[in-house]
């Protein structure tokens, strides 16, 4: 029997698919919930229920999965606009600000989200938080030659950084762009995401950080109500 978290993720992935229509250019996110959405999309396309779909992936992992499922893909540079991007998040606060980058894909994810006419975030209820960064560390992608410099600069603004290490190889995680990732914690969490996003990105050697500010249009939240998985839609007023 599936655990409750998996049931929530499956419910929210299916709800997201209902927003997809024929002829759309789609941003296909990364992570476990987004992977369930991509699988559901592949099933809709193969059954003929969705036609003329083009996907733009946010990670190599997503590209491999979409290709295996027969979803037509284009590179980011080949599209001028994305109709709808669907992606997960590691944390979401009440103002729709996000932390992403648990899979070290946040650079491509932010590019796709910023190009999308509509950006829908799919999460289970455990990802909804009052304050960002109290539980999940903020990923910052850095040039390999600059990681120590960036770590010191982040320390000057109150952050404690750790170089993200790989689990199945000796050494650090290397992103799809060939860079390294610092995972950063701020005491008391992040109370002003908009200012901090710019502040970190202004440090020389930083490519991008995992704060997604004012990008999400809707958050679909998988939840369990009376033992049954369901989905709650949160939209900006």
From Swiss-Prot:
Active site as annotated: 109 (proton acceptor)
GO cellular component, one term: cytosol
Binding, substrate: 30-33, 87-90, 100-103, 127
Name of the featured protein: Ribose-5-phosphate isomerase A
Species, as recorded: Prochlorococcus marinus (strain MIT 9211)
Keyword list, A-Z: Isomerase
Reactions the enzyme catalyzes: aldehydo-D-ribose 5-phosphate = D-ribulose 5-phosphate
SMART domains documented for this protein: DeoRC
CDD domains: RPI_A (cd01398)
């Amino acid at each position: 029997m599936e655990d409750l978290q998996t049931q929530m993720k499956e419910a929210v992935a299916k709800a997201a698919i209902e927003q997809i229509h024929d002829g759309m250019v789609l941003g296909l996110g990364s992570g476990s919930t987004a992977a369930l959405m991509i699988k559901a999309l592949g099933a809709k396309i193969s059954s003929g229920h969705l036609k003329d779909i083009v996907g733009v992936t946010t990670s190599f992992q997503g590209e491999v999965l979409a290709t295996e499922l027969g979803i037509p893909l284009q590179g980011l540079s080949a599209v001028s606009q994305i109709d709808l991007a669907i992606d997960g998040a590691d944390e979401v606060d009440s103002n729709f600000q996000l932390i992403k980058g648990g899979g070290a894909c946040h650079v491509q994810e932010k590019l796709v989200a910023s190009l999308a006419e509509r950006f829908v975030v799919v999460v289970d209820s455990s990802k909804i938080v009052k304050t960002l960064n109290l539980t999940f560390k903020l990923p910052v992608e850095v040039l390999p030659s600059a990681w120590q410099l960036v770590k010191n600069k982040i320390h000057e603004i109150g952050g404690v950084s750790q170089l993200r290490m790989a689990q199945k190889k000796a050494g650090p995680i290397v992103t799809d762009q060939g860079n390294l990732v610092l995972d950063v914690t701020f005491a008391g969490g992040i109370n002003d995401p908009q200012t901090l996003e710019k502040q970190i990105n202004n440090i020389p050697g930083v490519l991008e950080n995992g704060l997604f500010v004012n990008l999400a249009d809707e958050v679909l939240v998988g939840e369990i109500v009376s033992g049954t998985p369901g989905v709650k839609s949160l939209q900006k007023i």
